[in-house]
């Protein structure tokens, strides 16, 4: 099961504003997945696993650092969930709070950006990952790209690979492509 906590556009805008000014929101937008609803083997019987993508969190905090704020950030997200689902906090047996700095440390993704490139209008759709590099082709003949840095982005799991493979098949059927 999936759920989002972002009841209005104004709510989402306020959540983003905090990050824009170097802090995290006291009422963040939360995109949550309860994976064990789909795959019960992920948790013991009667229990569940839930992942929350809490937006928006700046890489650099204006008045502190993520090592200091990590648990408070987690408390903030948990309080928002509790406000929408009373009793939620009593059900949490364990949590791990992962900040943008943690993502960068663990994976090498610059500033913890999981989208493999800014997810802004100039780098979306046929501009993803950059103008002239869309359609999964590269300037190197026979070399293609896919992943969260390509259309439609990392939020649509599996789609970049499917779409890239379809591009490869179309090019093979038509005689390939000769780079750009």
Regions found by a protein language model. Give the residues of each.
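Conserved FAD/dinucleotide-binding core of flavoprotein oxidoreductases
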Residues: 44-76, 80
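A conserved FAD-binding loop/helix module that cradles the flavin
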Residues: 148-169
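Flexible loop/turn segments at secondary-structure boundaries
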Residues: 38-41, 58-61, 100-102, 151-154
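A glycine-rich dinucleotide-binding beta-alpha-beta segment and adjacent secondary-structure elements
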Residues: 23-33, 87-151
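Hydrophobic, well-ordered secondary-structure elements that form the walls
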Residues: 52, 77, 81, 143, ...
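Short glycine/proline-enriched loop/turn "hinge" motifs that connect secondary-structure elements
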Residues: 40-47, 134-138
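Mid-domain catalytic core of redox enzymes
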Residues: 1-43
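Active-site-proximal substrate-binding core of FAD-dependent oxidoreductases
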Residues: 93, 98-100, 169-180
């Amino acid at each position: 099961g999936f759920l989002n906590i972002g009841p209005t556009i104004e709510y989402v805008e306020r959540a983003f504003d905090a990050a824009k000014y170097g802090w995290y929101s006291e009422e963040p937008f939360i995109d949550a997945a309860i994976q064990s609803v789909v795959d019960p083997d992920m948790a013991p019987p009667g229990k569940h696993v839930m992942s929350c993508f809490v937006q928006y969190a700046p890489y650099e905090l204006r008045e502190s650092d993520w090592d200091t704020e990590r648990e408070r950030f987690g408390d903030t997200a948990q309080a928002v969930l509790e406000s929408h689902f009373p009793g939620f906090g009593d059900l949490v047996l364990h949590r791990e709070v992962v900040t943008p700095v943690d993502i960068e440390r663990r994976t090498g993704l610059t500033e913890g950006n999981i989208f493999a490139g800014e997810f802004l209008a100039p780098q979306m759709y046929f501009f993803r990952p950059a103008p002239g590099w869309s359609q999964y082709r590269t300037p190197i003949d026979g070399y293609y790209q896919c992943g969260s840095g390509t259309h439609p982005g990392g939020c649509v799991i599996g789609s970049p690979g499917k779409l890239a493979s379809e591009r490869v098949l179309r090019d093979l059927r038509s005689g390939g492509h000769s780079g750009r």
